[in-house]
Regions:
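Oxyanion-binding "anion nests"
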Residues: 1-21, 25
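Internal helix-turn-beta structural module
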Residues: 15, 23-27, 31-134
């Protein structure tokens, strides 16, 4: 069997200005091909998360955003209020290598939250869809 995704990716957005904004932000993160590719590669690239949030057109201030990656292997904070954090790359790799990963985003601007689900983006997915013709 060929799989297009190997892991479940959950994005939780909390402390947003509104539930609608939180939903748009979370959906943009799990829908981003760059985030999906980072999850496949177990790459703790929080810049891709903020980039996807920017594409959402939802209101947020990047300088307030904190990001952590979580799984059964632990949790690693990578960004605090828009600034990079020093973090253990080996731990981040372990956290992101699990089959279920959560991208925890705190926008630090309100009280609303939302969650969205997606998956990673694998070589097989690209191959299948690159070869597919209607």
């Amino acid at each position: 069997m060929v799989n297009g995704g190997h892991k479940l990716v959950t994005c939780t957005v909390k402390n947003s200005r509104s539930e609608e904004a939180a939903e748009r932000l979370a959906k943009a993160v799990v829908g981003s091909n760059l985030v999906k590719a980072a999850m496949f590669g177990a790459d703790a690239n929080w810049g891709r998360v903020l980039c996807a949030m920017g594409y959402s057109k939802a209101p947020f201030r990047p300088e307030y955003v904190s990001v952590a990656f979580e799984s059964a292997a632990g949790s690693v904070a990578v960004c605090d209020k828009g600034a990079a954090l020093d973090f253990d790359e080996d731990l981040a790799k372990k956290v992101l290598s699990e089959n279920e990963v959560t991208i925890a985003v705190d926008v630090n601007e309100g009280e609303d939250s939302a969650t969205a689900w997606g998956c990673d983006l694998t070589y097989d997915y690209v191959k299948i869809n690159g070869d597919y013709r209607t």
